[in-house]
């Protein structure tokens, strides 16, 4: 097996990773990163000969390999048969893929996003991006705005630090009473996510970090007409 590492697709995180691996003296090629100046670009056939293949985070979008930095499309079902059982495959958010790839193609796919430290590090740019979108979407300052963060996971925790630091009047909703205690201890107002009815009309900005439906039609009708919801 060749000791080459192939970085296939992804965004600037994968470009930075490829560069760091090169700086460590490893043999690295990239494919699908040309718009981000990915190092050592190689044809797909050559990249697929590598012993270790690093896939994006997330690996797929709409059935295709996640390729935001190229105009090329590659269907996931076209890729899997071209990989070998003796390759080490690493990707992000692979829960739905790993078992099927082992069963159907004999491939072993490990999820690097399963590490807590990776998820925390990834939450930082996500939270910062949410702040950027909020500032672009409103003509008012974050300072003195009434903000609600729905959810107290990794991104919610970071926003609960960032927004008060900018002077926002910040409330955070959570399900667990232990989380509500931490929210209050950090100086934010705590609300129960299941009991948001009647509370939403006061907020200028709402950050929903929960990956499920919380703000249904009846809740949305409670919000102000100029409320920005992310």
Question: Where in this protein do the model-derived segments appear?
Answer:
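NAD(P)-binding Rossmann-fold cofactor-contacting core
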Residues: 24-38, 166-186
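Glycine-rich adenosine-cofactor-binding loop
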Residues: 6-16, 21, 143-164
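Conserved mixed alpha/beta catalytic, RNA-binding, or beta-rich assembly cores of soluble enzyme
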Residues: 56, 112-115, 136, 157, ...
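Rossmann-like adenosine-cofactor binding region
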Residues: 58-61, 73-86, 183-230
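Short loop/helix-cap segments at secondary-structure boundaries that form the rim of catalytic
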Residues: 36-38, 99-104, 179-186, 200, ...
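Residues in the short beta-alpha loop(s) of Rossmann-like NAD(P)-binding domains
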Residues: 11, 34, 93-95, 175-176
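Extreme N-terminal starter segment of soluble prokaryotic enzymes
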Residues: 1-5
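Glycine/serine-rich phosphate-binding loop and adjoining beta1-alpha1 elements at the start
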Residues: 54-144
